[in-house]
Amino acid sequence: ERLRAGDVLDDAGQPLGPDAPHRVRQRVWYWRALPSEPRVPFEAELLFRDDELLVVDKPHFLPMTPKGRYLHETLLVRLKRQLGLDTLVPIHRLDRETAGVVLFSLRPASRQAYQAMFRDRQVEKVYEAIAPWRDDLVLPREHLSRLEEDPQTFMQMRPVPGEPNSRTHIALMERHGDWARYELRPVTGRRHQLRAHLNELGIPIAGDRIYPTLWPEPPPDAEPDYRQPLALLARAIAFTDPVTGQTRAFESRRTLAWPAQSQDAAG
């Protein structure tokens, strides 16, 4: 039944049917039933589709792929069922808490070419974030640091001595009371890079449940709290299409709201 429903995947994220051939040492992924899986009350928006690519505007709080307590309430599973695209695979990823533009591959034959764009840093990515305003912070600036996983928390990335392995261009877009909107252009793609870099500068992103300190983990049966989304948006992405040779540019239609206290202060 699970095989027929497409709930068993191979390592590439492709569904294995009942008649799929067996390969030695093949790993498969089983989509288990989650009776208590919470419904994520936000929808993705389709921005573009051709024979090779699907471009989606992801909402906050929706995981990219099955993990933990989320299976059906993930962007990949929703899109596969909505569009009937069994070959759909994400080319890159956004954190569950982050909203914005994300690309999916439709055809296995061209997938590697698109993945190589990200590996070889041939993609221009632009993010927006809302974080505290610091009048002593010189902007624009290029921030470099060496980020490694914190062995105490495992969830956080922390700066350590050594050769930098992460780089982000940071610019001020506008100020709003005690808050500011920043434009972030990552050159590298370390885990939590943008969140960790702004935290290093003393301006952690509004609504961040990981930086500077971990928020308490809610009980497993607790209702999700959607009142404070992470104020981080993957606003735009641009690249030369490796298959067609065309210049591609896509932009999110979402916006980030100012934190309530900033609005109160401005009023």
Regions found by a protein language model. Give the residues of each.
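RNA pseudouridine synthases
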Residues: 1-267
